[in-house]
Every structure is written in structure tokens, then in C-alpha cells.
């Protein structure tokens, strides 16, 4: 793929109305979109190179269970190569919980998952009230 095509793809992702980030197989963030910056308040410079579980997003589910270490949808996708979709609540840079729908997709080389992509979009708080954390 030539440089112009890569630039075009990056521009398309950055202008999309959702956030997106890419993890390698060790759950290190290797790409962080402008949509992700807008939704979370974290810049690409702040997130790229960090492990997703140390990046500050601290996802919880609708019961308040913290997902990032043992119940992470991205970790499960990297492990089993299966797509997932789940409403979760991320913590933005200002420390507020934001309801988002996450969709994870594995990145393969042959039959081996090398990482994963997460797309996320904001959900209405009226339909997804912020749970108490456990």
C-alpha cells in the first residue's frame, strides 16, 4: 500500500463519527484516532505506547464491574479471534464516566490474532445510566 493510500485511510478514520484504537498482541495501543481523542479527551500522544489497561479509560460494565484486567472485550478478542459488541462506560480525561458501545475486531496474520481494533460511539445517558462502581 502506498503512502497516499495510507494517508487517505487515516483521514477517513479520523473524520469518522466514532472513536477507534488499535492494540497489538500485548494490549499496547498502537493507533488512537481523532474521534477517540474527541470522545475521551486523551490525545494520541497521551495514549499511543501505553497498555490499554494503564491508559486511564478504566472501562466498567452496566453492573459497575471493572473490565480492564480480567474481563476486557479486547483481550478476549485477541485471545479467541472473535468479534464482540458491548455497552460499557469509559472514564474520560476529566474523570467522568461516558456510556459507549464498543465493537471489537481481531487483527489476523494468517490464522493468528496479532491484536485487535476497537470502535466506540457514545450512547445516550438517558438510556444507559452510569452505574456505581464495584
Residue ranges with predicted function:
Residues 1-5, 121-134:
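PAS-associated C-terminal cap
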Residues 36-51:
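PAS/PAS-like sensory domain cap-loop motif
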Residues 18, 85-86, 102-103:
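Short loop/turn microsegments at loop-to-beta-strand junctions
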Residues 5-8, 55-94:
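Terminal output helix/cap of sensory domains in signal transduction proteins
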Residues 30, 84, 91-98, 114:
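PAS-family sensory domains
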Residues 24, 33, 61, 92, ...:
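Short, acidic, Ser/Thr-enriched surface-loop or helix-capping motifs
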Residues 102-116, 122-127:
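Short loop/turn elements at sensory-signaling interfaces that couple input to output
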Residues 2-28, 32-37:
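Sensory modules in modular signal-transduction proteins
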Amino acid at each position: 500500500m502506498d503512502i497516499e493510500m495510507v494517508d487517505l485511510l487515516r483521514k477517513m478514520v479520523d473524520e469518522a463519527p466514532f472513536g477507534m484504537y488499535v492494540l497489538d498482541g500485548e494490549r499496547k495501543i498502537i493507533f488512537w484516532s481523532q474521534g477517540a481523542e474527541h470522545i475521551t479527551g486523551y490525545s494520541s500522544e497521551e495514549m499511543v505506547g501505553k497498555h490499554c489497561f494503564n491508559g486511564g479509560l478504566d472501562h466498567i460494565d452496566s453492573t459497575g464491574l471493572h473490565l480492564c484486567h480480567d474481563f476486557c472485550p479486547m483481550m478476549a478478542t485477541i485471545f479467541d479471534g472473535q468479534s464482540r459488541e458491548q455497552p460499557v462506560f469509559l472514564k474520560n480525561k476529566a474523570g467522568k464516566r461516558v456510556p459507549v458501545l464498543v465493537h471489537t475486531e481481531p487483527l489476523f496474520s494468517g490464522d493468528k490474532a496479532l491484536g485487535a481494533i476497537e470502535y466506540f460511539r457514545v450512547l445516550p445517558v438517558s438510556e444507559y445510566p452510569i452505574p456505581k462502581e464495584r
